[in-house]
Amino acid sequence: RVEDGFLRSRGLGAELVPPLSLVVDDLGIYYDPGRESRLERLIASPLPPGGGARAARLRARILGSGVTKYNLVRDTPELASRIAALRADKPGQPVILIPGQVEDDASIRLGAGKVRTNRALIETARQHSPGAILVYKPHPDVEAGLRPGSVPDAEILADLVWTGADAHSALALADQVWTMTSGLGFEALLDRKSTRLN
């Protein structure tokens, strides 16, 4: 199997921006829990000498540079102030980032649990954390109208719909991430954010 790499490109695959990295797996693919993948085997294997230090340096470099899967343009002074206002309205409540996904993506078909749509993910987060500040970030391919997964009433379901935001800025302002199978969940784990898979 071949899939976009975790650090894909500077732009969207749906806009035909070529990938800078690919995952090639001769056994399965990382998002399919029904089959073992080469990545799973590598993770289960002992690290080579110096492997832990190398991984720590790579993690620090990724976080320090702010690179993400798509590396979209950074925004967000206005959005940072909107989050601050929401925090003032709901003191002590966490900001939960909900990354939207392309709903016909193979990762959802093969890797998601009961929650399989962006709308259901927002509703699940609200049900389990009624007082939290829910920030929904549509997937950039969906936002561009290139793939399915739109949530027309997202502004009613979430406290803020964060369009045009890059993953790095979104993670910096969030306390938690709730996802189905989004790579942004992996980026959140790298950043040691509380991450929930649904």
Could you tell me what each predicted segment is?
Residues 1-198:
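Catalytic-core helical/loop segments in enzymes performing group transfer/polymerization on anionic/lipid-linked
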